[in-house]
Amino acid sequence: MNQKSCNKCIFTMLSESSYGVEFLKVIGVYAVLSLVTLRIKLFVTPNWFDPGGLVTNHYMLTRWKYTNNEQSRVLQWLIPDGLHDLTGWTIPEAYMFQRWFFVLLAFVCFHFFLRKWFKAPAAFGAVCFLAAVMPLSYMNYLQESFSLLLFSFVLILWLIREKLNWQYAVVLLLASMNNETVLILPAVFFFYNFKTWKFKPLCKLTGLTLLTCAPAYIWSAWIRFFTVYICDTQHLGGGWHLDVNLHNLWFSLGISPFQYWKAWYLYIIFVFGLLWLFAYLRFKDKPLFLRRASLMIPLFIICHLITGRIEEVRQMLPLAFIIVPMGMIYMFPELKIEIS
């Protein structure tokens, strides 16, 4: 069979399933959406091309001489470094491809993750909403673990929902090598699988939760020890930001609405807008998985208020995979196809 015939057979095989046809329809649109978000990111990030920016940072990362948390997020710089070696692309080009490709995968994965509960047009709209709010998170800094974090976060949620426990453990480990934010997701695993307060089932679930997340936590502890105590890297900006975050949030609430466009500390509210509220209205009508997963959200926000700079609203974007479908079920209940 020649290559053309083989390609035709693959195309036909994909087209035989309704989801295959849907995939072929949406992937091109999402590829362009990912390109649009990349173009905006590059426009607002001169550091990408400055001599002392991305290339210099990458050089220091590959020699274990950069700052944490970036140094510990090894996949964010190992993948572009591998692309650079394999293809001959420049370092900025390799990082461009990484961001474009993983954001595309996140869009596709989010679309089909939602198809359990929504018809295709609603899933498509949810992805477009995510693409529309992503530029709000873009600032002139380099946080290139973001794209793979976005993809891995929704993929792990999907694996937890389908109770694919060992696949979840493997992906969680790999994702933790890119960004430690995914370490919150074992809470979703526990909440979703919780059934009773009886001692024996509770101990069994606790043990399974700890067992499946142990590799990711062990890796994260080791890489942090290695980078801090062996490589002597410093934590950029420190690890305590609660007082600054709360002060600036309170201050920003009092500024003129005409200044909201640069009120970075309010972006945590703006990024999902009323969907923050809609997600919790008629809560019992939401699917069990989303209700249980949403219990993680307060923990997620508190952790970022304490250890992160909350004006960097990209930190909230992974919550879109929970907040957006919950809000949409309240807004458009007629579009849901299954609640479970």
Q: How would you name each of these model-derived features?
A:
Residues 97-117:
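Transmembrane-helix motifs of polytopic, lipid-linked glycan transferases
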Residues 66-89:
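Short hydrophobic/aromatic helix or loop-helix immediately within or flanking a transmembrane segment
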Residues 1-36:
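Start-transfer (signal-anchor) and selected internal transmembrane alpha helices
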Residues 154-157, 166-180, 185-192, 207, ...:
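Membrane-interface alpha helices of multi-pass inner-membrane proteins
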Residues 147-170, 323-326:
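Specific aromatic-rich, kink-prone transmembrane helix
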Residues 110-132:
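Transmembrane-helix signature of polytopic, membrane-embedded enzymes
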Residues 74-77, 92, 124-149, 177, ...:
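Aromatic- and kink-enriched transmembrane "portal" helix at the membrane-lumen/periplasm boundary
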